[in-house]
């Protein structure tokens, strides 16, 4: 392995037989976690560490998401990639990030909320109108395992920015008529800066710091928004979370984000599923381990099983073994009709609990029923033959 480089599967936290969907899902989660613009670190050292991790995650995804590069890496490791020129060629981690999340995605936090890591609009829209804040809003909500398997409704509360109704988003008393041309840039939005270098004087065009590139200045600040150009409204919205969502997946309301002068952003709601102490998910199936008294397993009888609808009684046959599986068809995740996916199964795995304590009299009676176990007898014969050799 190339010096200093971690295993790409380890970087993404996946196994070597992970599917392309597993790879993409792991990348989306880690890229969101370490994006330099999402969480500004408390110190420069931590910030640099996050940037390095972000670069590492993107590099791992670029290789493992490409069938040919992944095959080369699986066979020869980092050395194989070096020989092919991958590491020397270099790459832009943000290009990879944008290819997955979409062009124009950024987190541009403006300090309102830890969840307001939001997306910029496209370049085309930015050319038409200067938006003083990010239009798209991203929120994170948590649901439990049962809410994931059955689907649920959630009420969310969030703050939404809208253009000020008093100044129509211009930030000045009287709206657009309350603006003057910027005196520093004469309304151009930029100024020419001269800088000396070894090659002589170099002229460069830079954004006007006085008007922030807008070419106009406010004469009198709007009293309603104090020249911010927007006001904040409190929103309450009920959303439907369909059954079967994976943790980290998102719901999108195309016009539920911020608004500015008739332009609406998206509301992106990332859904995180809390782990269950009883159940585990395996694709569409749900798996649960059930403790059973060994005596009940031997003689058969009624046990209580956990299901997604609650605890139910189930009759097990005599001689039920530890590790044996009970499959309840359609007892797993049930998708809505729009998904057109078959419901999964509930898979119960039997595990023996610690035996009960019995009195000497009870133990004496139990010994009367003990008879040679053929499986144990076969094991002992194998053991004896092992010693003979």
Swiss-Prot record:
GO terms for molecular function: ATP binding; heat shock protein binding; unfolded protein binding; zinc ion binding. PROSITE patterns: DNAJ_1, DNAJ_2, ZF_CR. The keyword Transport does not apply. CDD domains: DnaJ (cd06257), DnaJ_C (cd10747), DnaJ_zf (cd10719). Its cofactor is Zn(2+). Participates actively in the response to hyperosmotic and heat shock by preventing the aggregation of stress-denatured proteins and by disaggregating proteins, also in an autonomous, DnaK-independent fashion. Unfolded proteins bind initially to DnaJ; upon interaction with the DnaJ-bound protein, DnaK hydrolyzes its bound ATP, resulting in the formation of a stable complex. GrpE releases ADP from DnaK; ATP binding to DnaK triggers the release of the substrate protein, thus completing the reaction cycle. This is Chaperone protein DnaJ.
């Amino acid at each position: 392995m190339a010096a200093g480089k971690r295993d790409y599967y380890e970087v993404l936290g996946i196994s070597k037989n992970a599917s392309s969907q597993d790879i993409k899902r792991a990348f989306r989660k880690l890229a969101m976690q370490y994006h330099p613009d999402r969480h500004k670190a408390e110190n420069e050292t931590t910030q640099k560490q996050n940037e390095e991790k972000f670069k590492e995650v993107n590099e791992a995804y670029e290789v493992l998401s490409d069938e040919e590069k992944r095959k080369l890496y699986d066979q020869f490791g980092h050395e194989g990639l070096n020989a092919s020129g991958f590491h020397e060629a270099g790459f832009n981690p943000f290009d990879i990030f944008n290819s997955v999340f979409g062009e124009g995605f950024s987190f541009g936090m403006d300090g309102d909320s830890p969840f307001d890591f939001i997306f910029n609009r496209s370049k085309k829209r930015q050319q038409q109108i200067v938006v003083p804040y990010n239009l798209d809003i991203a929120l994170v909500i948590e649901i439990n395992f049962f809410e994931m398997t059955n689907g649920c409704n959630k009420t969310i509360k969030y703050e939404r920015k809208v253009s000020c109704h008093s100044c129509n988003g211009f930030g000045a008393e009287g709206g657009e008529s309350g603006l003057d041309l910027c005196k520093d840039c004469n309304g151009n939005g930029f100024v020419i800066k001269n800088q000396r270098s070894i090659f002589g004087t170099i002229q460069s065009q830079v954004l006007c710091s006085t008007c922030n590139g807008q070419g106009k200045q406010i004469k009198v600040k709007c009293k309603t928004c104090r020249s911010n150009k927007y006001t904040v409204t409190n929103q309450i919205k009920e959303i439907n979370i369909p059954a079967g969502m994976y943790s980290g997946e998102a719901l999108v309301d195309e016009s539920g984000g911020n608004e500015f002068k008739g332009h609406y952003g998206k509301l992106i709601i990332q859904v995180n599923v809390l782990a269950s102490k009883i159940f585990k998910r395996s694709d569409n199936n749900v798996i649960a381990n059930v403790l059973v008294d060994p005596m009940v397993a031997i003689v058969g009888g009624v046990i209580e099983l956990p299901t997604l609808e609650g605890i139910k009684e189930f009759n097990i046959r005599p001689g039920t073994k530890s590790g044996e599986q009970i499959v309840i068809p359609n007892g797993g995740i049930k998708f809505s009709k729009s998904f057109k996916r078959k419901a999964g199964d509930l898979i119960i795995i039997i595990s023996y609990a610690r035996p009960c304590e019995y009195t000497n009299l009870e133990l004496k009676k139990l010994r009367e029923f003990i008879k040679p176990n053929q499986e144990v007898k076969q094991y002992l014969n194998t053991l004896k033959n092992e010693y003979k050799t």
